[in-house]
């Protein structure tokens, strides 16, 4: 997704990215909001079920984001906790694109179950979440 989002498969999710081509700014580099995984864990379920993605315009006006971009050469391997805000940045028309492999590592059983997720929600709506965090 080209909007910032979190992956909802598992709160213990870890992804590995391997670039097979050089990735420059216009090639759609992986982009991550540094330390966002800590804030997101507190609001995991509301983001998972209430907000599919967050446009950058919604974030940048209210938050000074500490963004890390994966602008790297072919052969680069990096790890990301994609429970934090991340995206694949927009690809420019001049770009030849990028080729990468992504591996996902998840727990055997998520630490939270659907039976108790309502009691873990610190916010009552996506609107409440956005107002208090962004």
Regions found by a protein language model. Give the residues of each.
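Histidine-centered catalytic micro-motifs
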Residues: 2-8, 85-88
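Short helix-to-loop capping/linker segments positioned immediately adjacent to catalytic or ligand/cofactor-binding
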Residues: 3-4, 18-20, 64-68
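Residues in well-ordered beta-strands of folded domains
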Residues: 5, 17, 31-33, 102-104
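Alpha-helical and His/Cys-centered functional microenvironments
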Residues: 9, 38, 90
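Short, conserved beta-strand element in jelly-roll/cupin
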Residues: 9-25, 71-74, 79, 104-108
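Double-stranded beta-helix
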Residues: 25-85, 110
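Non-heme Fe(II)/2-oxoglutarate
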Residues: 77-79, 83-134
């Amino acid at each position: 997704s080209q909007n910032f989002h979190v992956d909802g498969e598992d709160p213990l999710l870890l992804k590995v990215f391997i670039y097979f081509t050089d990735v420059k700014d216009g090639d759609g580099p992986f982009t991550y909001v540094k330390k966002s995984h800590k804030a997101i864990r507190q609001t995991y379920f509301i983001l998972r079920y209430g907000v599919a993605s967050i446009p950058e315009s919604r974030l940048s006006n209210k938050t000074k984001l500490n963004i890390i971009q994966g602008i790297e050469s072919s052969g680069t391997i990096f790890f990301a906790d994609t429970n934090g805000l991340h995206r694949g940045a927009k690809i420019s028309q001049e770009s030849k694109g990028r080729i990468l492999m992504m591996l996902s590592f998840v727990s055997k059983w998520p630490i939270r179950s659907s039976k108790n997720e309502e009691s873990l929600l610190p916010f009552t709506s996506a609107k409440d979440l956005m107002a208090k965090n962004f």
